[in-house]
Design a protein with these regions (language model features):
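Active-site-proximal alpha-helix that buttresses catalytic centers in soluble enzyme cores
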Residues: 1-139
């Protein structure tokens, strides 16, 4: 499952090893129930096992925040950060709040590049997977 390449071009440096200058932040809403994040942590851990530098960040309730995750990656020497929102659709959080947060990151960390992937539901492969999942659930 990947973002459409037309919107987020593949980055040959992501996962290139310890000398890579690129990292990923998986950005999710957050919840009061701590177990809520377990699937996200599993995705993060699987991506890390592939050699990517990946951090989780949350819009609210949970930590770290997007700013804290970005600050940590930049302190570790990463110059390109791709933010992958784990939201199914483009609502207020992705249309208004995330762009404002990314604008703030760009001002505070002018020497870094911040990219933003589209919502999960913008990817035809994600929609096909959801359709297949629903079909399995009703049979």
């Amino acid at each position: 499952m990947r973002a459409p390449s037309a919107q987020v071009p593949p980055d040959p440096l992501v996962g290139a090893g310890p000398m890579s200058s690129s990292a990923v932040i998986l950005f999710a809403h957050g919840a009061r129930e701590p177990d809520w994040a377990q699937p996200l942590e599993l995705v993060r851990d699987r991506l890390r096992a592939e050699g990517l530098r990946v951090e989780l960040a949350y819009l609210e309730i949970m930590a770290p925040s997007l700013e804290d995750a970005a600050r940590s990656l930049i302190a570790d020497g990463y110059k390109t950060v791709t933010i992958v929102p784990l939201f199914l659709a483009q609502g207020k959080h992705l249309k208004r709040q995330l762009p404002e947060m990314v604008a703030t990151l760009r001002k505070r960390h002018a020497d870094a590049e911040f990219r933003v992937a589209p919502a999960l539901g913008d990817d035809p492969e994600i929609l096909a997977a959801i359709t297949a999942w629903v079909n399995r659930a009703v049979r």
